[in-house]
């Protein structure tokens, strides 16, 4: 029996059916991106910039572009996918890698809703996937700090939907529908003291209290811990996590229901490794729980 999958299934069922909502935090403040921030975690480089409003634009592929699948060589099985090259225009955000810490600012690429992301360290050069499978795909790209926190300016997030070989209608963000993007945690994370960064991006609706028109609430559940509801997009530090695998679910809700759309609900897992991970900064306290 796959325990992780079973746990995820239970978490999704709990979140979708709904628990009582308790809103936490004030209305989100419209603040500028901090300039040259110090890393909140030892072992990671400090941030640089930005030098102005961060803007990111996907130049290729074009929206709704149909990328042909190359024919297979004679005697070989049919080709199942095609190379896809990404090109972007990025302004006012420096990408770099620090030699001492082997960390730095870069872009992250997310294809559809898979669990892994792909770091893009030099946005002046194209990024090519050797083969994406046939069908419709949505790629999301955004800049991150060395410690994994995303830049949250609206113009710093870019999304494009295209097709490889055929249009199957899957992995499509409907126009105007909210889009939830999980930045962290993903994969393996250091957690000697049990503190792990939870960071997300949301487009298509403001994350705020229900009194704000067209707003959404951000709800997450980790393992068997009480569900948490947030009304702002500040990063959250998950505390007291033991080494090993943890399952979690994050969703965008209105009136205690998941909002419609292909990218409004995410279920995944991450692994906390043994090793030092310093305490999170005091400015980012853990969110309050909503109860069992």
Model-inferred region functions:
Residues 13-26:
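Bacterial N-terminal signal peptides
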Residues 72, 80-86, 192-198:
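Structural beta-strand segments of beta-rich domains
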Residues 89-99, 201-210:
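Short amphipathic, basic-aromatic surface patches that mediate peripheral association
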Residues 115-123, 226-233:
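Short beta-strand segments within Ig-like beta-sandwich modules, predominantly Fibronectin type-III
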Residues 129-136, 238-245:
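Surface-exposed, short loops/turns at beta-strand junctions within beta-sandwich domains
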Residues 144-152, 228, 254-261:
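Short acidic/polar inter-strand loop motif in beta-rich domains
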């Amino acid at each position: 029996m796959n325990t992780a999958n079973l746990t995820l299934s239970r978490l999704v069922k709990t979140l979708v059916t709904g628990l009582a909502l308790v809103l936490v935090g004030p209305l989100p403040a419209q603040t500028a991106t901090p300039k040259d921030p110090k890393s909140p975690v030892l072992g990671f480089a400090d941030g640089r910039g930005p030098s102005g409003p961060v803007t990111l634009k996907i130049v290729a592929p074009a929206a709704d572009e149909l990328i042909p699948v190359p024919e297979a060589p004679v005697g070989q099985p049919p080709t199942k996918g095609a190379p896809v090259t990404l090109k972007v225009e990025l302004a006012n955000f420096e990408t770099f890698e620090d030699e001492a810490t082997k960390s730095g600012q870069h872009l992250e690429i997310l294809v559809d809703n898979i669990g892994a992301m792909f770091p893009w360290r030099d946005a002046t050069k194209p990024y090519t996937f050797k083969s994406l499978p046939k069908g419709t795909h949505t790629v999301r790209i955004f800049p991150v700090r060395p410690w994994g926190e995303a830049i949250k300016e609206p113009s710093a997030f870019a999304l494009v939907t295209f097709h490889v070989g055929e249009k199957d209608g899957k992995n499509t963000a409907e126009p105007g529908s909210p889009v939830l993007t999980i930045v962290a945690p993903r994969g393996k994370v250091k957690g000697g003291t049990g503190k792990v960064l939870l960071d997300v991006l949301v487009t298509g609706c403001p994350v705020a209290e229900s009194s704000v028109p067209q707003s959404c609430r951000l709800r997450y559940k980790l393992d068997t811990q009480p569900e948490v509801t947030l009304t702002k997009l500040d990063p959250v530090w998950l505390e007291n996590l033991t080494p090993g695998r943890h399952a979690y679910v994050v969703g965008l809700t209105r009136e205690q229901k998941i909002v419609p759309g292909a990218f409004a609900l995410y279920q995944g897992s991450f692994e906390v490794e043994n090793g030092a991970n310093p305490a999170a900064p005091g400015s980012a306290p853990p969110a309050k729980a909503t109860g069992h």
